Amino acid sequence: MTLVFDVGKTNKKGIIFDAQYRVVWETSITIPETADEDGHACEDLAALCDWLRSTFHAVMSDARFQIDAVNCTAYGASFVHLDQDGRALTPLYNYLKPYPDALHRQFFDTWGSEQSLALQTASPVMDSLNSGLQLYRLKYEQPQVFEKIKWSLHLPQYVAWLLQTFLQKENKPLPVSEITSIGCHTLLWDFSRQDYHRWVYEEEIERKLPPVSHQRGRGLHDSSAALIPYLATVQEPFLLLSTGTWCISMNPFNTEPLTAAELEQDCLCYLTYEGKPVKSARYFGGHEHEKAVQQMAREHQAPADFYKKASLVPQSSAEADYLRFMTQLIEKQAISTQLAIGQSGVRTIFVDGGFSKNEVYMRLLSAAFPHMNVFAAEVAQATALGAALAVHVAGPIPPDLIAFKPY
């Protein structure tokens, strides 16, 4: 059995898979946010650690489960900064926290234009969403704190390290860095050199980053983890549209280099856990959808989940508004997805995550790509399953892990 912790921005899950990768147990929690020293909302790191610890020990002491492997996945663009005793020195800053204009200008005046750094690191410039800029900010805004940092860990690697400390109480394990986290829009990784960018060394940021480990089970960035079940079981080329807060079109079969124009439209490269680039395009669609349906529900005095009954033939004024909104959302989504398709010749789109269960979304998306095969993909806990498959040791991987519904 494999135990996986899937730490999402909203939901935190603990999941156990059996040898056939069926979910045999799961639990989830939503942890209320707290605030950092500036009053900005952020993850409650102490509450997260408490939940991880109690859930881990409950599973390990449960006679029903024989856990052979443990892994985790979490959202990216977030650092936990540890002192020499392994204590967190700062809040877990939110990647949506505004970035100071003066510091932004200072960085690019020193290290080169936004366009050149974006091309070298396959990262659109997004301020706090570029986790490397969070480290730069800490160095210049809180130099005393920066000096005390022994290790800065991306959240997936912090969770993995924490899980190891639960197992090894006597000797604390050494933390590591991991390629899926380093390679996801961080401005840290030079894709052509396959090494940290020059600025990371010259600012002495790399001294705060643990050695890169290619050992499995050291945590995965959630977007890279979600791709693994498809790469493991699907034979023909495909694009995966992974939907959640972000809707990310990921094309492992597009080998064209990123262009400046694509970067300006929020294209980027992720890295698989094997270190291969995955050309992708992001759209904040889930976030836009959440805000819009809340507003529509208020305006029409409709239930919060009114949109779940919506179809292409509206039955109410709220549903008519929803259809108009979704038509606009799909127009933006189609532009984003087409950027990831590029000249790759991919003819199949798989949609997973929340929107894969939304009939309006799926039918409008299929209409936007009439010459493509569009499928809603049903896979139990895709991101967590990817993390479990990443520590797969022996034996064949079942071919029926994913159910596909054509549109």
Feature-to-residue mapping (PLM):
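Active-site core segments that coordinate phosphate-bearing ligands/cofactors
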Residues: 4, 108-123, 133-149, 154-172, ...
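Active-site phosphate-binding/coordination module
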Residues: 59-130
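Conserved beta-strand and immediately adjacent loop positions that scaffold enzyme active sites
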Residues: 1, 13, 78, 178, ...
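Glycine-rich phosphate-binding loop of ATP-grasp-fold ATP-dependent ligases
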Residues: 90, 125, 180-189
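N-terminal glycine/serine-rich phosphate-binding loop of ATP-dependent small-molecule kinases
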Residues: 1-91, 347-348, 363-373, 401
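Short, basic and Ser/Thr-rich N-terminal targeting/leader segments
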Residues: 9-11, 68, 73-75, 129-131, ...
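Nucleotide/phosphate-binding loop and acidic/charged catalytic motifs
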Residues: 70, 97, 173-183
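Non-globular, low-complexity intrinsically disordered regions
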Residues: 210-214
